[in-house]
Amino acid sequence: MVVTSNGKCEWAKEMKEFDETKAGVKGLVDAGISKIPQFFVHPPESLATPSKTTKNVQLELPTIDFEGVQTGGAGRKEVVEEIRKAAGIWGFFRIVNHGVPLHIMDAMLEAVKRFHEQPVEEKKLLYSADSSQRVKFNSNGPLREYDSACWRDILTCVFHDDQLDPEAIPLTCRKEVQEYVKCMIQMREIMAELLSEALGLSSDHLSSIECMKSEALACLYYPICPEPEKTLGTDKHSDTTFLTLLMQDTIGGLQILHDDQWVDVPPVRGALIANIGDLMQASLTIISNDKFISVEHRVLAQPVGPRISVACFFTPSLRAGAKPFAPIKEILSVENPALYREFLFREYCQYYKTKGQDVTSALPHFRIERILP
């Protein structure tokens, strides 16, 4: 954000007042504001469009049809090849006919809306910026001084090794969260097989190393914004995960950075969006060694809304996350050496958090520097 001469005091004051309400961004909207608080204003370079534009070129996210993928045969091989191409070129792809029932998806979106639109007194009980709290409600989590806040509220539910005490989940969305996570775990198993095969590994490889054994469910609520041109729903970033599966409603606003162009990802009812995380690209087990890419993306603030989305972030099991991993020997060679050093999952996350908005990906920090002969 832009910091004026007395900006230090103003930033701290506004942030403190906002946090103390424990009402989130929706609380500001409900109060009838016509201008957004200064700490939500993003610098021009953050809002700017890259040098290239999509005015003359229509780019469209790859869509992959999973129909019959579990029966094997030529259809599965075709899907694996499509995933390999999309993950290596785009880092994102849309999935249709994935097997998650539409009524469960709709119920989950409605439950998220119901949670965020309940009385503030109910949500306050979960308001926290403590990253160790497995179920919490907040807007941005801990921000570094002068970082710009994003125009959204989040309910987060973290399942370590697929487990979370049901009583910890808010009653207003408990049933829907449990049912949706079951579907996400089933999708994870399918995706783990297909991604393994796309990397040229045995289909059980990713499952065996437990690199996606935990889930963090981010239930996002993007309220209508009175000045959407000044802020963002979610700032530019890449995911500090292994894989993310996203469900979004009909509002839209998601953009991915492809070939230095912001590409809109319009909603498709019943579809899921898969995106490769930083850990898939290079960290944790250094699985893909840049065969797959984790790309930056953002969500625009909107003059309409609310926009509802649910992101399921897959991360390592507690056991796998506690160990450093080396590059997989099967995909390394003299021509294809390791690109990143070993590191722990927590080491990556800690570095990412310390950099705040100064970095959209922590991958360069762990890349091996090579001196050319």
Residues of each region from the PLM?
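Peripheral, non-catalytic segments flanking oxidoreductase cores
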Residues: M1-P373
